[in-house]
Amino acid sequence: MTNKQKTDALDKLIRMSQTIKEHNSDNPDFKNWKYLCVRTLISIYGEKSSEAMQIANMKFYYNPRLWVSGRNYSQEHLECFNRDFEQAIKLLELLKSDKEL
């Protein structure tokens, strides 16, 4: 894969992120995007690369140490999703800029 192909692939992922309107880790469009991110980063950087593992290990949902019955965690889930989603996009942008050098 040439550097041009790599930057094009990363740019495609960044553009695809803008089409995800429902900020929910169960959203099929989001799940497909995350899977494609991981597969693309593996093809660029390798199976055990920190770049691929960084996005693969992002949770995109709130995981409290202790679940309280009847408690609504939707706000916490949204905050965690937005934080991780923004972090993933920034990582893709950083990786793209590194390849453009």
Predicted segments, located by residue:
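Charged interaction/catalytic cores of defense and host-pathogen modules
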Residues: 1-100
